[in-house]
Amino acid sequence: MKNFYTDSTFLSFELQNEYKEFSFSSMDKKDNNFSFEMTSFENAFLFGLLKKYKPTKILEVGLAAGATTRMLVDHVFKQENCSLFSCDLNNNYYRDESKRTAYLALDKYTPDQKKWHLLTGKYLPQYLNYIGGDIDFCILDTVHSLPGELLDFIAVLPFLREGTVVVLHDVNMPLIWQDLPRRNAHSNEVILDSTVGEKIICKDPNNFGGISNISAVVINKDTYKYINNVFSTLSFSWSYLPNQEEIEVYANHYLKFYDADTEEYLRNIYFLQKEMLERVNNTKNTKKSKENFINKIKNLLKKSVL
């Protein structure tokens, strides 16, 4: 394991504490009790990477309330030559539709289309031509369930330069959260394990066994050479089915940067995943109908006894 992973020694406890303070001091007092979707350790990991690699073009995919976005914008505005592109499919915050996506960042900053570009309401491939290439730092933190971030990673790879750091959040969500409904939230773990490149993983002292919920991979020439390893994982069982429009957007995008076989592979996998998920849903509905029928009979028997 030690030979496979990079020991993130730049992530000292001092650095973790520094960014713990930064993460809260950068928020207004009214937001201090907000439940951040990254812990102080995970923020330290992220900003430790920024400090070490000094990127000039950052892509953030998945914004939620915008706590991490706000810290990233704060970082970018302090750098002389650095820009941030923040993307999310949702125009409004998924937990509270009355608020805009990234509202915590918007409370303090206004997108200026120079240092900070806020892009919401479309799928990632629909923004990539606008964003352009030479991205040297990328954060993937969206739905966490397959196909989720896997589709986005394949889409964005042609726009990443060699040496780009790709940060993957919630790589061990089912283990860390012990949340049964999210037990299949493996999309970023799948990306981490199937992508060829230098892996950056650090032990989190706050979790049992030091298991970390955030990791990174550094892109190199072999990442592109062995991208079929990543494509192959599209055959893993999906937790949800994207709509037809979404699949068309991604399939057409892949066709521009990969061979026709990969685009056809996505379409074939989509068809098979659709068949499987429909069978799963039908089984669930049948089981529920049986349970309802049994409960109805039980209630009738109780009434007849009374």
Segments from the language model and where they lie:
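S-adenosylmethionine/decaboxylated-SAM
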Residues: N32, N43, F47-L301
